[in-house]
Regions:
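Transmembrane helix-bundle segments that form internal channels/tunnels in multi-pass membrane proteins
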Residues: 1-72, 76-82, 243-255, 259, ...
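Membrane-interface helix caps and helix-loop-helix hairpins in membrane proteins
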Residues: 22, 272-281, 296-300, 317-327, ...
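Aromatic-rich juxtamembrane segments at the membrane interface
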Residues: 155-287, 293, 631-636, 640, ...
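Short hydrophobic alpha-helices at membrane interfaces in multi-pass membrane enzymes
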Residues: 257-265, 299-315, 348-360
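Alpha-helical transmembrane segments of multipass membrane proteins
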Residues: 266-273, 289-296, 312-320, 373-377, ...
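Membrane-interfacial alpha-helical segments at the cytosolic side of multi-pass membrane proteins
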Residues: 232-251, 288-295, 334-344, 405-409, ...
Length: 754
């Protein structure tokens, strides 16, 4: 049985972990293992392959069960644990690995994020602490097309977070890597591009400024920042060359051809450890081990066989890597390169000696730009049109000048040669200064792409395949029909009588989108925090991905969990109108009795009165949206006192099909008279699962259900979308209906709040 066949079995068996809605229980897994062993011992090849695939699938199930176990068993009360610090900001944010529980050794990879507390003495990576922990399971916001933090946590084996109530040092020694990194940081603090040198050499990107990261994203050069195959392969190649050079002076009987290969491999592993064994670096080492083993086998392997074996080895080593975006990008990029050069090789007329390096580099970048489009658009919702030009000088400069200098500087830092080391660091600093001087002269090349184009991004692949098989002349009708199908989302139009309400999952805040005829307005804009807000992180990307430009915003009130993203939205769409009860400059009024039309929908403000003395929550702008048959009542953070005041004025007009739960489901809102007068059928609530106020109140949830409402909230469902059409409505809950994955479940305590 060929190794490539085993690799295919492993890949096809583990990939379903990405889509499975639930994990089988352990009893089922053991039954499957027995069946897999029985099948793999059969004589017929297809039965043997099936048995191997079942065994690899069970290996993935066991890895997933191992990652889920801590969340369901360690979040029920205080835990006595020993934790090894793996990362820290030196203050209140720490990452660690649990190595023992209640005095017993833990072999599973249990990562934990600790926050909010200072440790009783100076902390550094590598220290071992005895702690009393209060842990909780990972739970992330989930929006259509948004960043999936919960999936990423599983891929990083970081599924627990929490606080420590007691901590005592067990071993205060810092790791060798931590000592080396601290020394290196002190040395590089004198250089302008020191943070970037640390990022390129050690993978420490926290100190790289946001402006630099944005510039690299806009120019398509962000991939150069990761400690990946480029850096580690360069380091391994340098050691391989050094070992070959040493062999030149040795007697022939002492020369073993495998030694340079093994030396390079060992140094690659050492360098990956030095950079913190980040997932991309660890995967590169695994791939290099596979490559070395294949090389020493004495057989000739095709590029596709090598690719399959490397990917399979990575997934067997860590089945949850199938959830990793970085692995998907790396594997897809290598596959695209193989495909590009095999199916569309560089024309021979371009291979003149003088033009060959430039032609090869341009050809490489064109291939990467075209063939990586499907994954770029799917993950990042766009691509950089300036990446072709930027990478033409950035890749050679970083690969052949900056990174070798940084590696040399890191090596010299181990020895007392300060003068020589400073020359190397200065040269590396100047090379990066030159690189970013050039990058800053390029126009902002980032191009947002909405979801309608994601199928058309497959065209470069399909055109190359069609050209090689002469499909355009053999079956032109099929090619034309295929293009029409790929472009279907561009010319398809939804029913004209429908409209949608989207409650975005923004955590402890509120942001709702009203959509009709390809237009949108927002009710509230999410929350803000130091250095960012919901609009930058979530709302603006969501709107652009869904091809929506907001025409206006209804702002319920001024609190930061509702108005936090307003400035960012206004920057993105300056012509957007704002309606609020705040009487701020440029705001249209939103007071009781006002009425307006938008896209055939009627908006009526029911609170506050124009001359109210109320402030904060009780001045929330309450708006009813009506299409003539069904309606929605948006209530902001209105509390019981204001609810009763609103009911005293034309309460019959408040009847609605759906209500947005006031004040995130707090005890101070959602009075019984309001729920009875609204007479609704569905209630939508927005909050974070782990919020400081323990919303929603159990009493409030029970009240809604008693009054006949269907209760839906963002922690349980993620983004909630309701589509209204003639005499009907359709509710889509992202976590349960559209992305029902085992890693999206509610882990830990069944109910956290109340």
């Amino acid at each position: 049985m060929g190794i490539h066949v085993i690799s295919i079995c492993a890949i096809l068996a583990i990939i379903p972990l990405y889509w499975l809605p639930v994990l089988p229980d352990l009893q089922t897994v053991w039954m499957l293992i027995a069946a897999g062993i029985a099948l793999s011992l059969r004589q017929k090849k297809w039965l043997t392959f099936s048995g191997l695939a079942v065994l690899f699938l069970c290996w993935g199930f066991l890895a997933a069960q191992e990652s889920v176990w801590p969340m369901n068993h360690l979040t029920k009360g205080p835990q006595q644990a020993e934790v090894v610090i793996t990362a820290t900001d030196g203050a209140t944010m720490h990452q660690g690995k649990i190595v023992s529980l209640n005095g017993e050794r833990v072999w599973a990879n249990m990562g934990v994020a600790l926050y909010g507390n200072y440790l009783p003495q100076n902390v550094c990576v590598g220290q071992r602490w005895a702690m009393t922990l209060r842990l909780r399971a990972v739970h992330g916001e989930l929006n259509d097309g948004g960043y999936d933090s919960q999936k990423n946590a599983f891929a990083r084996h970081q599924t627990l977070s929490g606080r420590f109530t007691h901590a005592a040092i067990v071993d205060e020694r810092c790791s060798l890597r931590s000592q080396y990194l601290t020394s290196l940081q002190n040395t590089l603090s004198a250089y302008q591009w020191g943070p970037l040198i640390l990022g390129l050499g050690m993978g420490e990107r926290l100190s790289v400024s946001r402006e630099i990261k944005d510039l690299m994203r806009e120019t398509g050069t962000m991939h150069l920042m990761a400690i990946s195959g480029l850096h580690i392969a360069l380091a391994a190649s340098a050691v391989w060359l050094l070992a070959r050079g040493i062999q030149f002076f040795l007697p022939g009987r002492w020369i073993i051809w495998q030694m340079p290969l093994l030396a390079g491999l060992l140094f690659a592993a050492f360098y990956a450890w030095l950079t913190g064994l980040q997932p991309p670096a660890l995967r590169t080492v695994i791939a290099l081990v596979v490559l070395a083993a294949l090389k020493m086998s004495g057989r000739q392997w095709s590029p596709w066989q090598v690719w399959l074996t490397c990917v399979a080895a990575i997934l067997i080593f860590d089945p949850l890597a199938v959830l990793s975006q970085s692995l998907a990008l790396s594997a897809f990029a290598v596959a695209a390169l193989i495909f590009w050069y095999q199916w569309l090789p560089l024309p021979s007329w371009q291979r003149s000696r003088g033009l060959r390096p430039l032609a090869t580099l341009v050809y490489l970048q064109v291939g990467m730009l075209l063939l990586l489009l499907p994954l770029q658009v799917l993950i990042f919702h766009g691509f950089s049109v300036s990446s072709l030009v930027a990478n033409l000088f950035a890749v050679p400069l970083v690969t052949f000048i900056s990174v070798p200098l940084i590696l040399l500087g890191m090596f010299l830092h181990l020895f007392p040669v300060a003068a020589l080391e400073s020359i190397v660091w200065l040269t590396a600093d100047k090379s990066l200064a030159g690189l970013f001087w050039l990058l800053m002269r390029l126009p902002n090349g980032w191009q947002d792409v909405d979801e309608r184009w994601q199928y058309l991004t497959l065209l470069p692949w399909l055109l190359i395949i069609g050209w090689r098989f002469r499909a355009f002349s053999a079956v032109p009708a099929v090619c034309l029909a295929g293009s029409v199908v790929l472009a279907f989302p561009l010319w398809h139009r939804d029913k004209t009588d429908s409209w949608s309400l989207h409650m975005l999952d923004v955590g402890q805040g509120l942001a709702m989108v009203i959509e009709r005829h390809g237009k949108a307005i927002l009710y509230d804009t999410g929350l803000a925090w130091p250095g960012g807000d919901s609009a930058q992180q979530l709302i603006i990307p969501w709107l652009r991905w869904h091809h929506l430009s907001p025409e206006g915003v209804i702002l319920s009130h001024e609190h930061l969990d509702h108005a936090g993203g307003l400035a960012s939205l206004k920057t993105a769409w300056p012509a957007m109108w704002i309606r609020s009860p705040l009487a701020w400059a440029g705001h249209l009024p939103c007071f009781r009795g006002q009425r307006w039309q938008w896209q055939g929908l009627t908006f009526t403000a029911h609170w506050p009165p124009e001359n109210t003395a109320a402030k904060g929550n009780n001045r929330s702008c309450v708006v009813k949206i009506d299409d003539g048959e069904q309606s929605v009542l948006l209530t902001g953070d209105i509390e019981a006192q204001a609810e009763l005041g609103m009911l005293s004025h034309r309460w019959r007009q408040l009847a609605s099909t759906l209500i947005q739960v006031p004040h995130h489901g707090s005890n101070t809102s959602s009075s019984t008279p309001l729920l009875q007068r609204v007479e609704g059928q569905v209630s939508l609530a927005s909050m974070a699962r782990y919020n400081a106020w323990r919303f929603p109140s159990k009493k409030v949830v029970r009240l809604y259900r008693t009054e006949g409402y269907q209760w839906l909230d963002t922690p349980q469902s993620g983004q909630i979308s309701v589509t209204f059409s003639h005499h009907s409505r359709h509710i889509r809950r992202l976590r349960e209906h559209y992305l029902p994955r085992w890693y999206h479940q509610w882990f830990g305590a069944p109910v956290d709040n109340g």
